[in-house]
């Protein structure tokens, strides 16, 4: 448990980026040239990357090379491809507006009741981690409830009342893409303006002096409207992750409509990804203590990424299987299922061990033994000194980010379910490997700055990051 002492408030950096003294914890104040170049590249090309993948499925049966070859050989032009792309429609705009409004309603106006009758589930009003400025925010954790209500209404309306077709998401997939982009850019722009003009917590704002970096990575740490509507928690969990399983169900329904059956590969993708989604919402309180909430500021990276990148690229396996139905042999299907379940077990148990250690302040058993830890201290931006412990027992003694290793095993299982016919469904494992490796290195850089020599003692005790004996 953290204790506090030695209050000495530092100066805060001004919006024009001029220097002032800073705390030892939080996102970097200065921007190096590589980070800036990477950010400008993503701002320019990430929307195009999403469009290219979705267009390749719609017009080229999920081939990533065919569009480029058509353009290179003169068989098609960019104008030809764009002309075949469905535009935004009034129906898609209405669907998307209704969807987002419904999720806002569930998030903001319906207090959680699941924690009252589900044993082991922690919901309702919960505290987040302490921010770099020393603030502890409160959250209404009701994601599981929102997921359950949404999916019950989906099945009732689509299959019992027949108010809409269960293929409605697939049938409007590209028009919905334009709506998601509009929301992503709108909320990111609003968050930046809010950070300058009326931030929720000015002490947790960071200005680098670079417009592109501020827009991409965000200024405010926890932008809010009112007491409870937290931008970061809402957009991280809703509407993208609630939609994830609905999108997959719509893809499965389309496969049924086109071919008269649903393949075992589509079932595998739906089941394995649903486990991940349900795990996220079951452990939403734990999520309040992860890097997304505890370190990232809210900018385009989270705002646009959660609206567009996540729902469109994380569901590529289901989309691919609509165009290329794959029926796996029973041994292959069981092997992929086992890989996904083992990966999930490692991911969940690794996180559970850390959560158990934190909740009990180390007074627990991990793998039948009293856990070992490295004692650390750090100073927040308000000048207060805090103490914490870094776990070196259980899976956390195997590698410093073994939860990421389990996550990558599950990600690989999603992709393997699609067979080896095309590269497109394997984008997810490639992307997740890059993302989690970068996150691993970024987290370690942050922890090195935060804990100093204590971090060196920790890395000596647990020398490997992701793969024991290798990396």
From Swiss-Prot:
| EC number per UniProt | 1.3.1.21, 3.3.2.11
Show the segment(s) annotated as Disordered.
1-23
Annotated function:
Oxidoreductase that catalyzes the last step of the cholesterol synthesis pathway, which transforms cholesta-5,7-dien-3beta-ol (7-dehydrocholesterol,7-DHC) into cholesterol by reducing the C7-C8 double bond of its sterol core. Can also metabolize cholesta-5,7,24-trien-3beta-ol (7-dehydrodemosterol, 7-DHD) to desmosterol, which is then metabolized by the Delta(24)-sterol reductase (DHCR24) to cholesterol. Component of the microsomal antiestrogen binding site (AEBS), a multiproteic complex at the ER membrane that consists of an association between cholestenol Delta-isomerase/EBP and DHCR7. This complex is responsible for cholesterol-5,6-epoxide hydrolase (ChEH) activity, which consists in the hydration of cholesterol-5,6-epoxides (5,6-EC) into cholestane-3beta,5alpha,6beta-triol (CT). The precise role of each component of this complex has not been described yet.
Kindly give the Gene3D superfamilies that the UniProt entry links to this protein: 1.20.120.1630
Q: Where on this chain does NADP(+) bind? A: 354, 358, 391, 396, 403-404, 443, 447-451, 458
Subcellular localization(s) per the UniProt record: Endoplasmic reticulum membrane
Q: Which residues cross the membrane?
A: 36-56, 95-115, 144-164, 173-193, 233-253, 262-282, 302-322, 327-347, 416-436
Its membrane topology: Multi-pass membrane protein
Statement: the UniProt record of this protein carries the keyword Secreted: no
Q: Which GO terms describe its molecular function?
A: 7-dehydrocholesterol reductase activity; cholesterol-5,6-oxide hydrolase activity; NADP binding
The organism named in the record is Mus musculus (Mouse)
InterPro entries on file: ERG24_DHCR-like, Sterol_reductase_CS
Report any one BP term from Gene Ontology: cholesterol biosynthetic process
UniProt signal peptide: none
Q: Main subcellular localization, coarse class? A: endoplasmic reticulum
Chain positions found as Phosphoserine? 14
Q: Which UniProt keywords apply?
A: Cholesterol biosynthesis, Cholesterol metabolism, Endoplasmic reticulum, Hydrolase, Lipid biosynthesis, Lipid metabolism, Membrane, NADP, Oxidoreductase, Phosphoprotein, Steroid biosynthesis, Steroid metabolism, Sterol biosynthesis, Sterol metabolism, Transmembrane, Transmembrane helix
Q: Family, per the entry?
A: Belongs to the ERG4/ERG24 family.
Pathway annotation from the record: Steroid biosynthesis; cholesterol biosynthesis
Gene that specifies this protein: Dhcr7
Report the gene knockout effect.
Answer: Deficient mice die within one day of birth due to respiratory and suckling problems. They exhibit abnormal cholesterol homeostasis with reduced tissue cholesterol levels and total sterol levels, enlarged bladders and sometimes cleft palate.
Keyword Transcription regulation tagged: no
Q: Which GO terms describe its cellular component?
A: endoplasmic reticulum membrane
Question: Catalyses which reaction?
Answer: cholesterol + NADP(+) = 7-dehydrocholesterol + NADPH + H(+); 7-dehydrodesmosterol + NADPH + H(+) = desmosterol + NADP(+); 5,6alpha-epoxy-5alpha-cholestan-3beta-ol + H2O = 5alpha-cholestane-3beta,5,6beta-triol; 5,6beta-epoxy-5beta-cholestan-3beta-ol + H2O = 5alpha-cholestane-3beta,5,6beta-triol
Name by which UniProt lists this protein: 7-dehydrocholesterol reductase
């Amino acid at each position: 448990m953290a204790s506090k002492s030695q209050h000495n408030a530092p100066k805060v950096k001004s919006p024009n980026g001029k220097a002032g003294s800073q705390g030892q914890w939080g996102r970097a104040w200065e921007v190096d040239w590589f980070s800036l170049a990477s950010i400008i590249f993503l701002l320019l090309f990430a929307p195009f990357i999403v469009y290219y993948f979705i267009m390749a499925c719609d017009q080229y049966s999920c081939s990533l090379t065919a569009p480029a070859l058509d353009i290179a050989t003169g068989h098609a032009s960019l104008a030809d491809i764009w002309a075949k792309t469905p535009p935004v429609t009034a129906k898609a705009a209405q669907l998307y507006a209704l969807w987002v409004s419904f999720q806002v309603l569930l998030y903001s106006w319906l207090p959680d009741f699941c924690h009252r009758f589900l044993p082991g589930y922690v919901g309702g009003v919960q505290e987040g981690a302490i921010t770099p400025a020393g603030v502890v925010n409160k959250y209404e954790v009701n994601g599981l409830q929102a997921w359950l209500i949404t999916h019950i209404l989906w099945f009732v309306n689509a299959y019992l009342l027949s108010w809409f077709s269960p293929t409605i998401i697939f049938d409007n997939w590209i028009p919905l893409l334009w709506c998601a982009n509009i929301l992503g850019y709108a909320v990111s722009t609003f968050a930046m303006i809010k950070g300058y003009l009326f931030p929720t917590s000015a002490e947790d704002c960071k200005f680098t002096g670079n417009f592109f970096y501020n827009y991409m990575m965000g200024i405010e740490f926890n932008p809010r409207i009112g007491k409870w509507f937290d931008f970061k928690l809402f957009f991280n969990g809703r509407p993208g992750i609630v939609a994830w399983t609905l999108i997959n169900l719509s893809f499965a329904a389309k496969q049924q409509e086109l071919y008269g059956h649903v393949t075992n590969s589509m079932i595998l993708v739906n089941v394995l990804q649903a486990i991940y989604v349900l795990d996220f919402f079951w452990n939403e309180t734990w999520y309040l203590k992860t890097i997304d909430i505890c370190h990232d500021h809210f900018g385009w990276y989270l705002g646009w990424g959660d609206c567009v990148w996540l729902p469109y690229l994380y569901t590529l396996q289901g989309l691919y299987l609509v165009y290329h139905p794959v029926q796996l042999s029973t041994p292959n299907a069981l092997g992929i299922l086992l890989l996904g379940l083992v990966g999930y077990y490692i991911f969940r148990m690794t996180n559970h061990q850390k959560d158990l250690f934190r909740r009990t302040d180390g007074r627990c058993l991990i793998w039948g033994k009293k856990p070992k830890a490295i004692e650390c201290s750090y100073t927040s931006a308000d000048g207060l000194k805090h103490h914490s412990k870094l776990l070196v027992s259980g899976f956390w003694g195997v590698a410093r980010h073994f939860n990421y290793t389990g996550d990558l095993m599950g990600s690989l299982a999603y992709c393997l379910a699609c067979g080896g016919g095309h590269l497109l469904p394997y984008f997810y494992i490639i992307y997740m490997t890059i993302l989690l490796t970068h996150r691993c290195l970024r987290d370690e850089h942050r922890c090195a700055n935060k804990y100093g020599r204590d971090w060196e003692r920790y890395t000596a005790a647990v020398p490997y990051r992701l793969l024991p004996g290798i990396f």
